[in-house]
């Protein structure tokens, strides 16, 4: 399952994603991974949630990010939830490219039974593609 949260910067998406991760970790049977482009949320997360700062790995585009996700999933078969905070802060891509990436991630989630939650910052003038809704 994949769930995408789209809203303007500063609307509280990160806070809600952290709360969701911490709450779900209490009942999760598998492992959880939280992916962000900076380490600030790390101290707010339950310590059993694996935190990954993408700045440490040089992730720049959709291909890099998808490869990193595949590596994370292939290295731990017990992953149940993945939380991605600020996708457009992590990678440089267009809304159309991100829709294609999200479709590829959705295929991964179906194949491996993983839940993925993604925060995306949008401008008021940007229209969210159908593939992301």
Would you name each region that the model predicts?
Residues 1-72, 127-129:
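Conserved P-loop
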Residues 3-5, 32, 79-84, 116:
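Generic beta-sheet signal
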Residues 13, 61, 65-68, 79, ...:
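Amphipathic alpha-helical interface surfaces
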Residues 76:
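Active-site nucleophile-His-acid catalytic modules used for acyl/amide transfer and hydrolysis
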């Amino acid at each position: 399952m994949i769930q995408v949260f789209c809203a303007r910067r500063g609307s509280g998406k990160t806070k809600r994603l952290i709360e969701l991760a911490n709450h779900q970790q209490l009942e999760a049977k598998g492992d959880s991974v939280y992916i962000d482009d900076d380490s600030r949320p790390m101290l707010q997360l339950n310590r059993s949630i694996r935190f990954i700062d993408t700045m440490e790995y040089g992730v720049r585009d959709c291909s890099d990010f998808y490869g990193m996700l595949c590596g994370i999933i292939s290295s731990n078969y017990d992953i149940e939830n993945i939380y991605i905070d600020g996708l457009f802060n992590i990678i440089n891509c267009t809304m159309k490219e991100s829709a294609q990436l999200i479709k590829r991630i959705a295929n991964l989630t179906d194949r491996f039974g993983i839940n993925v939650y993604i925060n995306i910052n949008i401008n008021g003038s940007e229209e969210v593609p159908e593939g992301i809704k």
